Swiss-Prot record:
GO terms for biological process: cellular response to starvation. GO terms for cellular component: cytoplasm. InterPro entries: SigmaS_Anti-adapt_IraP. It comes from Klebsiella pneumoniae (strain 342). It comes from the Bacteria. This is Anti-adapter protein IraP. The gene is iraP. Interacts with RssB. It holds the Pfam family Anti-adapt_IraP.
Length: 86
């Protein structure tokens, strides 16, 4: 029983480490996207945002994702593109 608990704790620690790495990657990408958007002229920025939003609207995920996950992705993209980090 102790071995099982120890194994579970090790797996949990690994998952937490993976989650931290993903969080850092997402934050780094947010910073890069924000910097790129800020260095673009307004018209080019708006055109890029519209292209991204249209591409997201046209994509059909395979395998299909649930509506809540799709909505979460759309909300996050809108926040990132329309209201970038300060």
């Amino acid at each position: 029983m102790k071995n099982l608990i120890a194994e579970l704790l090790v797996k949990l620690a690994q998952k937490e480490e993976e989650a931290k790495e993903l969080t850092v990657q997402v934050e780094a990408l947010e910073i890069v996207v924000t910097a790129l958007l800020r260095h673009m002229e307004h018209d080019a920025q708006q055109a890029l945002i519209q292209d991204i939003e249209q591409a997201i609207d046209q994509v059909t995920p395979c395998p299909p994702v649930n509506d809540q996950d799709a909505m979460l992705l759309q909300q996050y993209l809108k926040k990132l593109l329309r209201h970038p980090r300060s």
